[in-house]
Amino acid sequence: MELGEERYPIYVGAGLMAQLGALVRRHLPETRRALLVTDANVAPLYGEAARAALEQAGITTARVTVPAGEASKSLSQAYSLYSSCVRAELDRTSAVVALGGGVVGDLAGFVAATYLRGIPLVQVPTTLLAQVDSSIGGKTGVDLPQGKNLVGAFHQPSLVVADVETLKSLPRRELSAGMAEVVKHGVIRDEEFLKYVEVQVGNVLAGDPAVLERVVAESCRIKAEVVAADPREKGLRAILNFGHTVGHALEAAIGFRWLHGECVAVGMVAAAHIARHSGIAQEGRLELRLTRLLERLDLPTTLPEGMDPKDLEPFLRRDKKIKSGVIHWVMPVRPGEVVVTPDVSPDAIRWGLEALRR
């Protein structure tokens, strides 16, 4: 990842967990202490292997396990981790190592961004969604009762280590949810990659390691290109929010009972409907192509049964892409190309949301 004078490596491959300590020492040679943050689901699977790899490299490592789930992305949990940093005697050469999915990465990243005004962060994503999206780009944060990621900071990791072997332990539902972000990358930037995903759906869901490695590597490439051009989301990087306007609103409206990727899938379909109704989409019925692909990946493409689209409206008004009271929508023009625009009529939005009604 190249960010002007800043740069950091993204490692993608099988068997990287055993090399974690050596990789940290290579890129953070001054680091002698670390706080390893993981959750209750990941700790029994990889917690000891990660800690041992760090210790073998001469890095004294304290391990902290937080409850699994979105509720851990809170200021109270961050406060608890600050106390763990103090007990572990971390200094500005020490590292926070985030071992887990997006929740752990966002939470631990926020702590690394703010403890001692910023210490090194190592992302070790263990879910597909985290490997292809949330571990890259430096966004960290916690939630408030009023919505997701309302408190946060930009803090780039010192390195990302994505061991695709960890995907073997993922429940099928989480693997599918991660594929929503993969599809997003194809729609916003690379139609050839989108076609590859369409062809490889069966192999993805079967957990084919070679296919998953390519899916992760290509997604990382696409996201890295976008983030490198716009690290702090002043322009181009906003395209990575395709599907997230409605997706984040849906997550909050239903109390986070669906996975993030499931809500993003619905959000992408909504954006495609709105783009067609607004005359922005240049290719006919992209929403049908998207719907077919997402459904083959076992992802939802409509709202939960019985949900009124109007229930999304209060949460849409809190979208982070609002400027001067107007949402800037990420709209698909054609596969591989999107545009960010505030020029979307209320009628088109209503029509697009109604199209999601089950």
Curated annotation (Swiss-Prot):
In the Enzyme Commission scheme, what number(s) does this protein have?
Answer: 4.2.3.4
- Compartments (UniProt record): Cytoplasm
Q: What is its cofactor?
A: Co(2+); Zn(2+); NAD(+)
Q: Where does NAD(+) bind?
A: G102, V103, V104, G105, D106, T126, T127, K139, K148
UniProt-recorded Gene Ontology molecular function terms: 3-dehydroquinate synthase activity; metal ion binding; nucleotide binding
Coiled-coil ranges from the UniProt annotation: none
Q: Name one GO cellular component term.
A: cytoplasm
| Top-rank EC class of the record's enzyme | lyase
Q: Please, one GO biological process term?
A: chorismate biosynthetic process
Superkingdom: Bacteria
Q: Which reaction does it catalyse?
A: 7-phospho-2-dehydro-3-deoxy-D-arabino-heptonate = 3-dehydroquinate + phosphate
**Pfam families linked to this entry:** DHQ_synthase, DHQS_C
Tell me the residue numbers annotated for binding Zn(2+). E181, H244, H260
Q: In which pathway does it act?
A: Metabolic intermediate biosynthesis; chorismate biosynthesis; chorismate from D-erythrose 4-phosphate and phosphoenolpyruvate: step 2/7
Q: What Gene3D superfamilies does its record include?
A: 3.40.50.1970, Dehydroquinate synthase-like - alpha domain
* The entry's keywords: Amino-acid biosynthesis, Aromatic amino acid biosynthesis, Cobalt, Cytoplasm, Lyase, Metal-binding, NAD, Nucleotide-binding, Zinc
Q: Known PANTHER family for this protein?
A: 3-DEHYDROQUINATE SYNTHASE, 3-DEHYDROQUINATE SYNTHASE, CHLOROPLASTIC
Q: Which family does it belong to?
A: Belongs to the sugar phosphate cyclases superfamily. Dehydroquinate synthase family.
HAMAP family documented for this protein: DHQ_synthase
> Its function?
Catalyzes the conversion of 3-deoxy-D-arabino-heptulosonate 7-phosphate (DAHP) to dehydroquinate (DHQ).
Name recorded for this polypeptide = 3-dehydroquinate synthase
Native organism taxonomy = Bacteria, Bacillati, Bacillota, Clostridia, Eubacteriales
